[in-house]
Amino acid sequence: MRRHSSKSGVALPPVGQGPDACQMLTRAQLGQDPPQRTVLGVLTENEQYRRACGQEIATIRCFSGSENVFPAAGKKVLPDNGVSEPAKHGFDIYMDDPEQGDRDSCPGREGIVFEDVYEVDTSMLKSDLHFLLDFNTVSPMLVDSTAHAQSEEATDFGSDVINVTEYAEEIHRYLREAEVRHRPKAHYMRKQPDITEGMRAILVDWLVEVGEEYKLRTETLYLAVNFLDRFLSCMSVLRGKLQLVGTAAILLASKYEEIYPPDVDEFVYITDDTYTKRQLLRMEHLLLKVLAFDLTVPTTNQFLLQYLRRQGVCIRTENLAKYVAELSLLEADPFLKYLPSLVAAAAYCLANYIVNRHFWPETLAAFTGYSLNEIVPCLSELHKACLSIPHRPQQAIREKYKASKYLHVSLMEPPVVLPLQ
């Protein structure tokens, strides 16, 4: 991994080869203080958002190419139909041995050579693909401690289409059916040859930082992590390209969810130019193909907002529930084995107990069909995550919810023992 010369940055040394190559360095080994957060690049403000809010639109030009930026003078755009470019060596994708029950979770079809970002036959992907990438570029995991951004996220149930009162039960029923179809494999990390749970946690921690810097919605973060996990459930990725996959995931999620998504060039910049714009766009294209362009997925955040609307609580409990739910993103194991609706219910229960000394109201039990006994296993895991987060090196979520706009809920100490028996 590349070093960075910024005074405010912390760079991980190059990754070695051999049996210890998959081990992650902690901040203690690097001589860092625990409160500092891990970021994979230097971040900037969302200039596009300010331009769009502060200026009138003067001219609209039509062109083929990136939807975020106008093409530079003389730069090639997408070729016309029927005109192909010479084949170039790109990403090789190989077929894995199929497993029982895996066909529904990976929508691809056959092994292909991903030769050009614009020329791909979408009928050729197959389930259980392995993505074998060159290990010639390593992601720089850098910290920019000067970046202090606040999320614009504010609960506005009145404009949330998921919480339309007249159709709340039908919407919830549909989301419960959809979450089963779009869940990642619970233990996919066991089949990843070159990445670990710790590497994924560092990446998710960085995605939280990116979301805060560019003032992205919380739902954008949840979508990005969902895209990442579904992709890794089907593809084996070398660690040198893991950040590229994560960057493409949040780029795609921001295009889907945000009104003013950051430019592609911004996402290239936050990786410290480790990857080129072309590489990022190619990875975005591959991500779409592996996900079969299925981007509308239920998340824990959506279910939690439904529960908060159905059974209102004080603003402190609401913010604490959001904080607890977001902690579940850091760990693929054990939380991927629980459905998002169940994780949201556990987050609601834990926050409600910490603040109000009550767990699961009868109204939500009737609305969701979940009893407290069904929620207890996930609730126990979330409780452990809350107790351990002050001692973890990944502090982005905790720092985010230390802000006054969230009433400093991440500083609240949960009880050591929950009366669950």
Curated annotation (Swiss-Prot):
Extract the InterPro entries matched here: Cyclin, Cyclin-A_N, Cyclin-like_dom, Cyclin-like_sf, Cyclin_C-dom, Cyclin_N, Cyclins_cyclin-box
Locations listed in the record: Nucleus
Per the annotation, which location comes first and is thus the protein's main one? Answer: nucleus
Q: Which Gene Ontology terms of cellular component type are present?
A: cyclin A1-CDK2 complex; cyclin A2-CDK2 complex; cytoplasm; microtubule organizing center; nucleus
Q: Does the entry feature the keyword Nucleus, yes or no?
A: yes
Q: Which domain of life is it from?
A: Eukaryota
An individual GO BP term: cell division
PROSITE patterns annotated for this entry?
CYCLINS (PS00292)
Processing and modification events after translation? Polyubiquitinated via 'Lys-11'-linked ubiquitin by the anaphase-promoting complex (APC/C), leading to its degradation by the proteasome. Deubiquitinated and stabilized by USP37 enables entry into S phase. Ubiquitinated during the G1 phase by the SCF(FBXO31) complex, leading to its proteasomal degradation.
Hey, which family's this protein in?
Answer: Belongs to the cyclin family. Cyclin AB subfamily.
Q: What does this protein do?
A: May be involved in the control of the cell cycle at the G1/S (start) and G2/M (mitosis) transitions. May primarily function in the control of the germline meiotic cell cycle and additionally in the control of mitotic cell cycle in some somatic cells.
Quaternary structure, per UniProt, is: Interacts with the CDK2 and the CDC2 protein kinases to form a serine/threonine kinase holoenzyme complex. The cyclin subunit imparts substrate specificity to the complex. Does not bind CDK4 and CDK5 (in vitro). The cyclin A1-CDK2 complex interacts with transcription factor E2F-1 and RB proteins. Found in a complex with CDK2, CABLES1 and CCNE1. Interacts with INCA1 and KLHDC9.
The protein, known as: Cyclin-A1
- Protein species of origin: Rattus norvegicus (Rat)
